[in-house]
């Protein structure tokens, strides 16, 4: 059974999460960057294998703050993108696309993480609108799974020097969608002009449309798959600052989010930031059905980024 409900993202709160994430300075030794290009860096189709060689990351002095803005773009579909599923989609009105671009402009962010992007043409459309507003974010990553119309995207002012994104992430026990995460994992590393690196991961877990509990179960399974991926990522790069963001479709106390955070008091633990708006509110979505407010969009950082400065700047 499907639940019919009206919902809207908090435009005054964290329809976008904004965080000053460059509270520490970072550099990398023996790093081989990709060619500095504004073109999209292709994502892998499958999850990485085990046994990756440990990379050692050096930590230089602090640098200037870097601002990250994340947002669920709300079905950013444009006619130029091919349809990847049998579901009917509605193209996003020009006014709504302009509103997304304006939110990004107002944030002043150098890096933007997006979910529910309709494809390559949708990303180009947003970049074009940003450029008209004087915002240059030429570097990008797009993750689109076959059979899914909504994808993950990252736009950056700075070069993307590594892309380990996974389109088809295996999910244990999932009987649908060939046992993969619905929207994959965006995993890209951005390098600032002073040499610091930030590994950014974007996700969008299964929606909350089903009343029978299947959606919740799917999110939990996706969460375990993501947690396994995070464990490998943290173990394989010693000293890399890592930030996870996205639309989790679950609150802080829900099991999926708890699984993703990982075990307490270990290097694998992710710390959840709590950005607040000018009124001190933290909710990110409102459901008219039930008149309820929820925090489903989250931002997590690893121990390297979790300092008092990070908490103050969020």
Which positions does each model-derived feature cover?
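Soluble non-cytosolic domains of exported or imported proteins
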Residues: 87-98, 116-121, 146-149, 179-180, ...
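Second-shell loop/turn segments in exported
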Residues: 85-91, 109-116, 142, 174-175, ...
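Extracytoplasmic/secreted cell-surface and envelope-processing proteins
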Residues: 78-79, 121-125, 150-151, 209-212, ...
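Active-site beta-strand/loop signature of hydrolases that rely on acidic residues for catalysis
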Residues: 71-73, 103-124, 188, 200, ...
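N-terminal, active-site-proximal structural segment of metallo-dependent hydrolase catalytic domains
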Residues: 3-132, 140, 144-147
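Structured beta-strand-rich core segments of catalytic domains in phosphoester-bond hydrolases
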Residues: 117-199, 203-205
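Metal-dependent phosphoester-hydrolase catalytic domains
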Residues: 10-56, 180, 231-243, 249-309, ...
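Metal-dependent phosphoester/phosphodiester hydrolase catalytic core
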Residues: 82, 193-224, 228
């Amino acid at each position: 059974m499907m639940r019919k409900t009206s919902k809207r993202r908090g435009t005054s709160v964290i329809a976008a999460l904004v965080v000053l994430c460059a509270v520490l300075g970072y550099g990398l030794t023996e790093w081989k960057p990709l060619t500095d290009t504004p073109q999209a860096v292709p994502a892998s189709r499958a999850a990485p294998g085990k046994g990756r060689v440990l990379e050692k990351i050096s930590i230089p002095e602090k640098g200037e703050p870097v601002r990250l803005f994340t947002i669920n773009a709300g079905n950013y579909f444009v006619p130029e993108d091919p349809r990847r599923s049998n579901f009917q989609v509605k193209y996003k009105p020009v006014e709504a696309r302009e509103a997304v671009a304006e939110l990004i402009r107002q944030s002043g962010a150098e890096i933007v993480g997006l979910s529910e992007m309709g494809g390559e043409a949708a990303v180009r459309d947003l970049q074009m609108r940003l450029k008209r507003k004087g915002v240059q974010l030429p570097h990008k990553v797009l993750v689109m799974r076959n059979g899914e119309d909504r994808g993950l995207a990252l736009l950056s002012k700075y070069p993307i020097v590594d892309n380990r994104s996974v389109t088809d992430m295996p999910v244990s026990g999932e009987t649908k969608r060939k046992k993969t995460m619905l929207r994959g994992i965006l995993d890209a590393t951005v390098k600032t002009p002073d040499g610091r690196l930030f590994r950014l991961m974007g996700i969008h877990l299964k929606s909350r449309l089903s009343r029978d509990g299947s959606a919740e179960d799917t999110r939990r399974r996706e969460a375990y798959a993501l947690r396994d991926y995070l464990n490998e990522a943290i173990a394989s790069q010693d000293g890399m600052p890592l930030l996870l963001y996205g639309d989790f479709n679950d609150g802080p106390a829900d099991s999926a989010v708890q699984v993703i955070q990982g075990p307490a008091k270990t290097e694998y633990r992710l710390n959840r930031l709590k950005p607040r708006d000018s009124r001190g509110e933290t909710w990110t979505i409102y459901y008219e059905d039930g008149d309820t407010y929820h925090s489903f969009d989250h931002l997590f950082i690893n121990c390297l980024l979790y300092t008092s400065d990070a908490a103050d700047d969020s």
